[in-house]
Regions:
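Short, structured coil segments at secondary-structure junctions
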Residues: 55-56, 64, 159-163, 216-217, ...
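Conserved acidic, metal-coordinating active-site core of Asp-based
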Residues: 95-204, 208-216, 225
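Active-site metal-binding loops of divalent metal-dependent hydrolases
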Residues: 11, 43, 205-207
């Protein structure tokens, strides 16, 4: 019996600002049947708040699993050590890189004029971050995007790469999370809190940062627009986002399992 359904956001529930009406209907049907919907995303709580409120979803696992929020309030967080962020800011300042830092209430950027950040804005769409001046201390940070190449990335992670969860999503941009946190780890913590077993959960995704997530639950579902690597690991492959993939999977594989 499925008791919880976790949804990646970009490429799964929505494509930029477009979200199919069928996805809204599917989430509403899950709630009507007592199944807990959860957003599970690499974005910050700050960024996904409008979507969470629009869909009436209480729980969100954000920052690729490093932050868990309930109705926008931090319930659990796994932040970077302050010294790590301090060192990375010094490296970025010296090398001319830009850091996008995810806090619980806001996002912060070290250089707003960075061309890579501006390209990411055009391609993906970030909510506007607050500028963080070199002399300002950063708050608790749950995820860091570094706009740099793969070789330059090693200046930040050094010999301690195993301490971080690293997801490179462009040749010039990489997500880094503390203590090996990923979406699966964050969802597992939430499942424990709600006393739901992994086999009683479903998860939807389309990207490589959803790989651990869909393998960690009883019903892992890859979107039709996902890559082959994710599809090979999924229990089911649904239709694409633009072809009502969420509703199709909910009606075919989740609601029948919740009876």
């Amino acid at each position: 019996m499925i008791k919880l359904a976790a949804f990646d956001v970009d490429g799964t529930l929505r494509d930029r600002e477009y979200m199919p009406e069928s996805a809204r209907r599917a989430v509403a049907r899950l709630k009507a049947r007592g199944i807990v919907p959860v957003l599970c995303t690499g974005r910050s709580e700050y960024e996904i708040r409008p979507l969470r409120e629009e869909l009436g979803i209480d729980w969100a696992v954000t920052c690729n699993g490093s932050h868990i929020g309930f109705c926008g309030r931090t319930e659990s967080g796994n932040a970077f050590a302050e010294e790590t962020i301090r060192e990375w800011r010094q490296i970025a300042e010296r090398r001319g890189h830009t850091l996008l830092l995810y806090g619980s209430e806001n996002m912060y950027i070290t250089r707003q004029a960075d061309p890579y950040f501006q390209q990411a804005q055009r391609e993906i769409g970030f909510m506007e971050p607050l500028p963080l001046n070199p002399e300002e201390e950063a708050p608790a940070i749950y995820q860091c995007i570094i706009f740099c190449g793969e070789e330059e990335e090693r200046e930040y992670t050094g010999k301690n790469r195993q301490k971080f969860y690293i997801h490179r999503w462009r040749t010039w941009a990489v997500d880094i999370n503390p203590n090996g946190r990923n979406k699966a780890e964050g969802l597992r913590e939430l499942l424990d809190r709600l006393e739901i077993r992994p086999e009683e959960a479903a998860a939807f995704g389309d990207g490589l940062n959803d790989l651990e997530l869909i393998e960690s639950v009883g019903t892992g579902i890859a979107m039709g627009n996902a890559g082959d690597e994710l599809k090979e690991k999924a229990r089911y492959v649904t239709r694409s986002l633009h072809d009502d993939g969420i509703e199709y999977a909910v009606d075919r594989w989740i609601l029948p399992e919740s009876r």
